[in-house]
Regions:
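Conserved catalytic core of nucleotide polymerization and phosphodiester-bond processing enzymes
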Residues: 1-223
Length: 223
């Protein structure tokens, strides 16, 4: 039985930034990439093409990693000026995210470290390096670590709760693997339904965010 979080880093970003538009999309269970493409291109969601959605997806996840206009241009195979316009349009639609990212970098420079919602820290001496490229790297880490690190903290909580629930229930099914935002249980077929419910509940309720944590669960004979 395999369960993975749906867009957990973007959900963490929505929660931490409190951006109204992104929070609204997740609360209404909308496809965030389609919604982003529609808003950035100024069209209704039903008019979004697969290419538009793919570009929006690259920006959504790229923002989490502090992507530059040069990086986005490379990833999408478009001119740098187009990538720059796309990012500017993105931040216009999600102003809370732009302000939040700037705040993350500012706080990291002030404190010397970035931290997750649960208080896990990464110290960033790179931010005071005399070398520009190293300082830029430090800024990207300052943007990304609180988001990706919080997502990592959440799945660790889910792992502990799932393990404890299986032990407490006396199940023979075992939690055997974690891969990024995904948990895998080697389950007896006679316990399948119970295990699906336990895994879903433990993952969805691992941490309370301003938007729902969504989990996709699949069962198969092999991984």
């Amino acid at each position: 039985i395999d369960a993975d979080y749906s867009q957990i880093e973007l959900r963490v970003l929505a929660h931490m930034s409190q951006d109204e538009a992104m929070c609204k999309a997740f609360k209404e269970d909308l496809d965030i990439h389609t919604i982003t493409a529609a808003q950035v291109n100024g069209i209704p969601p039903e008019m979004v093409t697969p290419q538009m959605r793919s570009s929006a997806k690259a920006v959504n996840f790229g923002i989490v990693y502090g992507i530059s206009d040069f990086g986005l241009a490379r990833d999408l195979g478009i001119p740098v000026y187009e990538a720059k316009k796309y990012i500017a349009s993105y931040f216009k639609q999600y102003p809370g995210i732009e302000a939040f990212i700037k705040e993350l970098v500012s706080k990291a420079k002030e404190k010397g470290y970035a931290e997750t919602l649960l208080g896990r820290r990464r110290y960033l001496p790179e931010l005071t390096s005399p070398k520009y490229m190293i300082r830029q790297f430090g800024e990207r880490v300052a943007m990304n670590m609180p988001i990706q690190g919080t997502a990592a903290d959440i799945i660790k909580i889910a792992m502990i709760r799932t393990f404890e629930a299986l032990e407490k229930g006396g199940y023979k099914s075992k939690l055997i693997l974690q891969v990024h935002d995904e948990l895998l249980i080697d389950a007896l077929k006679t316990e399948q339904q119970d295990v699906v419910e336990i895994l879903t509940e433990c993952m969805q309720n691992a941490f309370e965010l301003a938007v729902p944590l969504k989990v996709d669960v699949h069962s198969a004979d092999s991984w």
